[in-house]
Amino acid sequence: MNYAKLSIAFSKKTIKTHNCRLFQRWLHVGDKVHDFRVVDTKKVPELQLNYTRLKHEPTNADMIHLDREDPNSVFSIGFQTPAENDEGIPHILEHTTLCGSNKYPVRDPFFKMLNRSLATFMNAFTASDFTFYPFATVNTTDYKNLRDVYLDATLFPKLRKLDFLQEGWRFEHADVNDKKSPIIFNGVVYNEMKGQVSDSSYIFYMLFQQHLFQGTAYGFNSGGDPLAIPDLKYEELVKFHRSHYHPSNAKILSYGSFPLEDNLSALSETFRPFSKRELNLPNTFLKEFDQEKRVVEYGPLDPVMAPGRQVKTSISFLANDTSNVYETFALKVLSKLCFDGFSSPFYKALIESGLGTDFAPNSGYDSTTKRGIFSVGLEGASEESLAKIENLVYSIFNDLALKGFENEKLEAILHQMEISLKHKSAHFGIGLAQSLPFNWFNGADPADWLSFNKQIEWLKQKNSDGKLFQKLIKKYILENKSRFVFTMLPSSTFPQRLQEAEAKKLQERTSKLTDEDIAEIEKTSVKLLEAQSTPADTSCLPTLSVSDIPETIDETKLKFLDIAGMKAQWYDLAAGLTYIRLLLPLKNFPESLIPYLPVYCDACLNLGTHSESIGDLEHQIRRYTGGISISPSAVTNNSDVSKYELGIAISGYALDKNVGKLVELINKAFWNTNLSNTDKLAIMLKTSVSGITDGIAEKGHSFAKVSSASGLTEKTSITEQLGGLTQVKLLSQLSREESFGPLVEKLTAIREILRGTSGFKAAINASPTQHEVVEKALQKFMKSRGVNQQTQTKSTSKERNGINSIKTYHELPFQTYFAAKSCLGVPYTHPDGAPLQILSSLLTHKYLHGEIREKGGAYGAGLSYSGIDGVLSFFTYRDSDPIRSLSVFDEASEWATTHEFSQRDIDEAKLAVFQGIDSPVSESQKGMLYFVDGVTDEMLQNRRKQLLNVSANDLKAVAKKYLVNPKKSYTAVLGPKSEKQLPTWVIDKFES
């Protein structure tokens, strides 16, 4: 620190500074900087940060700054935006504010900035009662650029009607070039929310919240109900912005090592046109009610789960005002005591007993609303068991109110909190920016919310008699009349009813259209298409240049050594936590057993051992470690995509003092699991498929990409078997088996193969002082297996069959589609890999975004390139017309061979690519690219040089070779049954 550069002058408690971040540490309550008055300062040692809260006196804007030695600095501005109906105004406004502003009138500056920046994070979010716009970057110029774009976008947006029609909703012909085609609803948010109602967990939670919070802003869908979105008028959107997007209603957060003074100066200048305004916002506080409420609704039938066990139900209790940080913390801990882990009382009573397969989406304590809600919910239940479940819930609470909880359980939870504070991710600031606003907007003191140590001290003091949680149960559960019982029953006709409701809505609206209205719709469609097709003049937007990209990598200093007979790498950390990763390569592993590897890995942490129950084992894991993970691994050879290495990956971390215990627990879980415990195996399988369809609906583009890529190489075929729709079908089948004998035989066979397999390797990220204790622990681990360690280097290279069909259509009960087309590229070390990586960014931003999102209305689209796997994948997300999108994929490939890319285009693509490459890596993850994928620093540096040198000719050459004339390409679509004839497709049906 250079204190000589610090210049501070005091004049009537007003501070003037010369651009130095150190001044904020000297600020006191009452000081004034650029119209901002300091109202609070605190040190938060457990998070290693200094907290400063300020008020902008002319407008009353609220700001907090979290000063921390972290170059990945964050900025966010948010506004309280409680919904007033189901039309999705807050959500659509979130989109349209980012479509051009006074200072930056270009269409869609948000997406344009994605490839003019080195941001490590850029996004915007609409919650139930607020909207916020966060970003993060390690580059100071970039930070200022993005801050200016975000501030102008939110406070001075253009809010053009054409942007509203594109992002929100519009009428248009199904084929915009055919006036005889039917008129439909379209729009980005409209299709996004149609995709959301494909998720039964989302439907359950939204219906639950709307019924419970009726009469408050939470009773409306802030994201928008697809049946209500077409009722929204453009003028209402503009009015909502004027009333809500104002500094008086704003909360600003900055985090990291960049100067606070610069932010205050920029904000003060931006806020200059505004004056303080009194706010009149809808009520968000739910008052108590005198008697229990009950509601039954209907939701979709899951094709993966057993039809008779798909009821979701919950009993909810109104709890505290969440602005009370300390009581909120205590209720969060109570929730963990009740629901977390195999030995928790509600898991044992509701799931282990077989009454349900998993907790419902709203289970536990929810503090994201102004009034906290404590819920006990279950999914995978039968309708006949509802009364029994309800009686059991009250019986358990009565028992807990009498007996309380074992102190060991509480200590394990507090240990997890302690270790999580020490385990810092590379995106720690964004994590705070995404979690803090929920309570901040609801009146909580952010300083109290951040001070975890004070919360724990308060908890221990209040629980000194050991009865705090019993008192909370009596107060908020047993003596609480404000109860709400909500149940959602499955309906096989639910998707059909949604489609019929949409058709009815469309018919009602279009039947009222006059000839003049239709002519205006067609005229507007032409205008919108022209605007979308006109190249944007982005000269007004700030940008970084390729020269801002460092030419050399930061070297990862690894030590290579032999530990307990294993080849190992070591990365030095400061004392505190020790991270251990183990990888066991599987050579010539039986093909028939490969799909069962995920089941085996899950079994290791779900069944317990012959001498310890899974509840006891899990308690030890929580008490002594930060967690243990066991999973299958499949990695492509970085010099030959036809080769790959299959394996088992094991990882865990603990406080330095608990490393011996960590490895002991890994040993128990990996080598000594009781695979014959079929009762627990049945529960594990049923839980694994519970809600799995919702996961597909949320990440449908990923499943589509995996499906379409599965026929390209041996490794991509294995990836699909381990984590694609093939695995989903296997889990569904296994979960319905009446006898688990055959499965136990397969799992036992896998363990015997693992016992006889050599080649373990290790990666340790820890303090050098930990070497001896780590070696002793790993020696015990290796001896317990009873096999001599021998390194194997031969890669698996046996032909495997992927998906045989060129085009596969996966029928699922969704409201929108996901499409993907995959082609084979090159291995990581091949020189064509760099231009393919740049090309994927170019086509995403310069062609696919405009053609599929803007014109087609899909929520997302792009071209991804996996440098390790050598796979190019076109994809769409929540798409209304996947067949059209597949044609656009082909058009994009041709366009890439004929379009004259400017140097600006290429430079922007390079910036976008390096956002990912240079994204900060936490200390705990250093060296993992080499450990897992075998990519050395030399390879990384060579790839970096190739990327920086990519030319327009390189791009055209690889586009023609790998996209227009691919050696192999496969296509997949996920979605509802197609109305179109698909004679050349293989139809893959998911049926209950």
Curated annotation (Swiss-Prot):
Q: Can you tell me which residues form the catalytic site?
A: 94, 167
> Which positions does UniProt annotate for Zn(2+) binding?
91, 95, 192
**Source organism superkingdom:** Eukaryota
Keywords, alphabetical: Hydrolase, Metal-binding, Metalloprotease, Mitochondrion, Protease, Transit peptide, Zinc
Which subcellular locations apply to this protein? Answer: Mitochondrion intermembrane space; Mitochondrion matrix
Which cofactors must be present for this protein to function? Zn(2+)
Q: How is the cofactor bound?
A: Binds 1 zinc ion per subunit.
Identify the Pfam families for this entry. M16C_assoc, Peptidase_M16, Peptidase_M16_C, PreP_C
Task: Quote the transit peptide annotation as a residue range.
Answer: 1-30
InterPro entries to which the protein is assigned, alphabetical = Metalloenz_LuxS/M16, Pept_M16_N, Peptidase_M16_C, Peptidase_M16C_assoc, PreP_C
Give the protein's biological function: Degrades mitochondrial transit peptides after their cleavage in the intermembrane space or in the matrix, and presequence peptides; clearance of these peptides is required to keep the presequence processing machinery running. Preferentially cleaves the N-terminal side of paired basic amino acid residues. Also degrades other unstructured peptides. May function as an ATP-dependent peptidase as opposed to a metalloendopeptidase.
Q: Subunit details for this protein?
A: Monomer and homodimer; homodimerization is induced by binding of the substrate.
Q: What is this protein called?
A: Presequence protease, mitochondrial
Lineage of source species: Eukaryota, Fungi, Dikarya, Ascomycota, Taphrinomycotina
